[in-house]
């Protein structure tokens, strides 16, 4: 037999074998689908969706349908610790009973697990009562906008579990919440791991992008439009929103962005001073030790990746400072966020961005009052200002925010902290973004946001006002704030309704305005106007600079 004939025979045999294997695989998949369908039929009229990993069977509440604890990536454990997220395979039996939240990611307090890359999908109620197949088709017809929530917690704490998006979902949007790697398991640069040749350092940001990729591939099966995704987040989640705006790898993944309290001084300083992965590995930053020092502190003097991957997660957590920040790694983040915004080299989509009027009062309460050490005297105030701002800045801060001008020292420290850490840095970001994209700016300003001062049993010496994270309970009802009741008054409910309308209308159109709420115009540096979110109804104001000492003091730094 000639060589060419032998080759043809081999090719034909391979083709036959491939067809047999493909046929067997198809039969197997068909069998799994049949079993999954039977399982779904046996689940009464519970909502279902068919994803790339198999069938998910959710549950229905008064607020809509929910699909909880869906794995969006392989568990990042063992050899996958400190690697980019990998695709999850198939659900066992091709079916997932998606009725419970997945584990939070490992964090202080013994909370969570490394097997934590789960997401949750919340959809509006489906009107059809003709069985799961009709409901599934009904979802496909809708093409609803998708809101992708990134939780806060300093990149150290937090999870998707506390956020009930019922109010948002009732406005005909789909909400996705998820977990991403935190602490040194999510943000860690070390030379041996870098030497493995994969993208490294910003694992938490990689998880966020991987979850966005899952949404793009699967959300249509829940009734969502993969081309109408808005990312939104608060605090470190808002910071992550800015990081994704600046990331070339996130291009095309979303068409709108909302950052709540996401721009703060340490974050800006970190990015404007360009802490690269290489620097993080060898020298670290003012607030975070180098990767080499961290490895040594957890017992890996050999500096090997195998040693580090064998370190218990709890040991890594114990070594963490608070908060953490991402790195400029040359791929996911190719430049500082400040440079990206200033140059216009970012993902150019409409933005909502804002802060709360009394952001820093929360941190004063946590650091002083709630640990039994309130700032009561002028001397105690001077010491607290030096601790916050250092010896160089303390004298001008004390002159601009004198103890005698405030009812008590906690409020005075809260004022300088709010202006210097949150409000003025945020306005600088607003000004940069607004030169390139429509940027809708706000200040949440409900001075009576729950919980009330009286709820703390006399520990608080000042009202919290519109503190950091206070706005969350107006978007996510029932969220746990200090473990205390957070019932909204009738006027606060009106403000909540307006905020939910703005946020969801923005997700639908890229513009927060609708006929039922006060007009919200894009930010212009010439007018410096912003939307003041006050009860019962938002109002346009232009006194941000005078309220927060920005151009007179903080902008000079």
Annotate each language-model stretch with its function.
Residues 1-17:
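N-terminal secretory signal peptides that target proteins for export/translocation
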Residues 2, 38-202, 479-499, 509-516, ...:
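Non-catalytic accessory segments of hydrolases
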Residues 116, 198-220, 283-292:
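Alpha/beta-hydrolase active-site loop
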Residues 23-34:
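Bacterial N-terminal signal peptides
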Residues 233-243:
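Glycine-rich nucleophile elbow surrounding the catalytic serine of serine-hydrolase chemistry
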């Amino acid at each position: 037999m000639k060589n060419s004939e032998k080759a043809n025979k081999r090719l034909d045999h391979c083709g036959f074998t491939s067809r047999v294997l493909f046929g067997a695989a198809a039969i197997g998949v068909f069998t799994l689908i049949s079993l999954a369908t039977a399982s779904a039929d046996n689940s009464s009229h519970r909502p279902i969706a068919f994803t790339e990993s198999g069938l998910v069977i959710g549950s229905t509440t008064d607020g809509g349908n929910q699909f909880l604890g869906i794995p969006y990536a392989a568990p990042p454990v063992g050899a996958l610790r400190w690697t980019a997220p990998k695709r999850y395979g198939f659900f066992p039996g091709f079916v997932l009973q998606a009725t419970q939240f997945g584990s939070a990611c490992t964090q202080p307090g013994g909370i969570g697990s490394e097997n934590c890359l789960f997401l949750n999908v919340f959809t509006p109620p489906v009107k059809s009562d003709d069985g799961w197949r009709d409901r599934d088709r009904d979802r496909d017809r809708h093409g609803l906008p998708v809101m992708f929530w990134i939780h806060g917690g300093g990149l150290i704490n937090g999870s998707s579990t506390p956020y009930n998006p019922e109010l948002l979902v009732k406005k005909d949007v789909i909400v996705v919440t998820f977990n991403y790697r935190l602490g040194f398991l999510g943000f860690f640069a070390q030379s041996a791991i870098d030497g493995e040749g994969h993208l490294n350092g910003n694992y938490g940001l990689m998880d966020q992008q991987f979850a966005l990729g899952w949404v793009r591939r699967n959300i249509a099966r829940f009734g969502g439009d993969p081309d109408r995704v808005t990312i939104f987040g608060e605090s470190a989640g808002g910071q992550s929103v800015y990081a994704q705006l600046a990331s070339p790898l996130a291009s095309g993944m979303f068409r709108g962005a909302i950052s709540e309290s996401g721009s703060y001084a340490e974050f800006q300083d970190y990015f404007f001073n360009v802490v690269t992965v290489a620097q993080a590995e060898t020298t670290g930053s003012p607030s975070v030790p180098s990767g080499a020092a961290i490895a040594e502190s957890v017992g890996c003097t050999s500096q090997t990746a195998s040693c580090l991957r064998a370190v218990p997660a709890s040991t890594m957590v114990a070594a963490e400072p608070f908060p953490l920040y991402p790195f400029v790694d040359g791929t996911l983040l190719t430049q500082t966020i400040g440079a990206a915004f200033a140059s216009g080299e970012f993902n150019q989509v409409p933005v909502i961005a804002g802060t709360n009027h009394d952001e820093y009062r929360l941190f004063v309460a946590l650091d002083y009052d709630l640990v039994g050490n309130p700032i009561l005297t002028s001397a105690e105030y001077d010491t607290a200002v030096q601790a916050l701002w250092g010896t160089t800045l303390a004298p001008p801060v004390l002159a601009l925010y004198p103890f005698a001008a405030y009812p008590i020292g906690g409020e005075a420290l809260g004022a300088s902290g709010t202006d210097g850490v949150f409000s003025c840095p945020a306005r600088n970001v607003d000004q940069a973004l607004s030169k390139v994209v429509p940027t809708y700016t706000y200040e949440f300003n409900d001075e009576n946001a729950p919980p009330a001062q009286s709820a703390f049993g006399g520990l608080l010496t000042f009202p919290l006002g519109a503190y950091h994270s206070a706005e969350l309970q107006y978007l996510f009802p029932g969220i746990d704030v200090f473990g205390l009741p957070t019932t909204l008054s009738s006027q606060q409910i009106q403000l909540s309704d307006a905020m939910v309308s703005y946020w969801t209308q923005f997700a639908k159109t890229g513009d927060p305005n609708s006929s039922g709420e006060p007009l919200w115009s894009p930010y212009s540096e010439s007018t410096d106007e912003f939307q003041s979110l006050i009860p019962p109804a938002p109002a346009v104001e232009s006194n941000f600079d005078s309220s927060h000492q920005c151009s007179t003091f903080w902008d000079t730094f």
